[in-house]
A protein has these predicted regions:
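Amphipathic/hydrophobic helical signal segments and adjacent flexible N-terminal regions
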Residues: 2-64, 69-71, 83-96, 166-199
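Beta-strand-rich cores of mature extracytoplasmic or soluble domains
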Residues: 121-199
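Conserved long hydrophobic alpha-helices within structured protein cores
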Residues: 70-78, 159-165
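Central antiparallel beta-sheet cores of small beta-barrel/beta-sandwich binding domains
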Residues: 76-149, 155-157
Length: 199
C-alpha cells in the first residue's frame, strides 16, 4: 500500500510540474547571426522557456562601475537576474543584467537617478551577447527620443575596466511640447565610448 501511495504521489508531483525547456545565451547569440533570421526566425529555439547563462558570461559585468565623460560623473550598478521575467505572464524567462544609473553634472548635482527603481522600472536591461559585447537597452528621457542600445564589454587584459557605448535610436514621434529643447538636448549617456572602472 505504501508503494502505491508513493507512486501516486510521485506521479501527481511530476504532472503538476511544468517542465522548463532550457536554452543558452550562446544559442540565442548564434540565432541573431543567422543570415535569414529576420524572415525565418529560429524555429529550433521556439519551444525554449528559459534562456540560461550556462557559462556565467554575465558575471563579469556584475558590480558597481564608475567613470566620467563630457563633464558628468557616472555610477552604473549592474545586477544579474536569474530566470527573470519582465511580466509573470511572459512565456520565456532569461538570465540577464538589469542596470541602474546615477549621473551627476560637474557641480555634483544629480541629473538622472534610477538607483532606487524596481527592476521593471530601471529601463536599462540586457538582451544578449554580440561576440564579446553584451547588448543592453536604455530608455532615458523618451519625450526627447532618448532610447537606444548600450554595448558593454570588459577589457581582456583588465577585467576591472569596462567599455560602454551608447547608440541612440532617435526612433519615435517627437512632440515638441514635451521636449521643447530637442535641437540642443544632450542625452544622459555619452555617444562616444566611455571607460568605467569596477569599484
Amino acid at each position: 500500500m505504501k508503494n502505491r501511495l508513493f507512486i501516486l504521489t510521485l506521479f501527481l508531483i511530476i504532472i503538476s510540474c511544468k517542465a522548463q525547456v532550457i536554452g543558452t545565451l550562446e544559442q540565442f547569440e548564434e540565432c541573431s547571426k543567422r543570415p535569414n533570421r529576420d524572415q525565418d526566425g529560429c524555429p529550433d529555439l521556439e519551444n525554449i522557456t528559459y534562456v540560461k547563462d550556462t557559462n556565467n558570461r554575465l558575471d563579469q559585468f556584475v558590480g558597481t562601475w564608475k567613470g566620467s565623460a563630457n563633464g558628468k560623473q557616472y555610477e552604473v550598478k549592474l545586477e544579474k537576474k536569474i530566470n527573470y521575467k519582465d511580466d509573470p505572464s511572459d512565456v520565456r524567462s532569461f538570465d540577464r543584467i538589469i542596470g541602474r544609473i546615477l549621473i551627476k553634472d560637474s557641480s555634483g548635482n544629480i541629473i538622472y537617478n534610477s538607483m532606487n527603481k524596481s527592476d521593471k522600472d530601471t529601463y536599462f536591461f540586457g538582451d544578449n551577447f554580440q561576440n564579446r559585447s553584451y547588448l543592453m537597452y536604455f530608455v532615458g528621457n523618451y519625450n526627447c527620443l532618448e532610447a537606444g542600445n548600450v554595448f558593454i564589454e570588459t577589457r581582456i587584459n583588465n577585467p576591472n575596466e569596462m567599455k560602454l557605448f551608447y547608440s541612440q535610436d532617435k526612433d519615435g514621434i517627437l512632440n515638441p511640447a514635451k521636449c521643447p529643447n530637442f535641437s540642443t538636448y544632450v542625452p544622459f549617456l555619452p555617444t562616444q565610448t566611455m571607460i568605467l572602472t569596477k569599484q
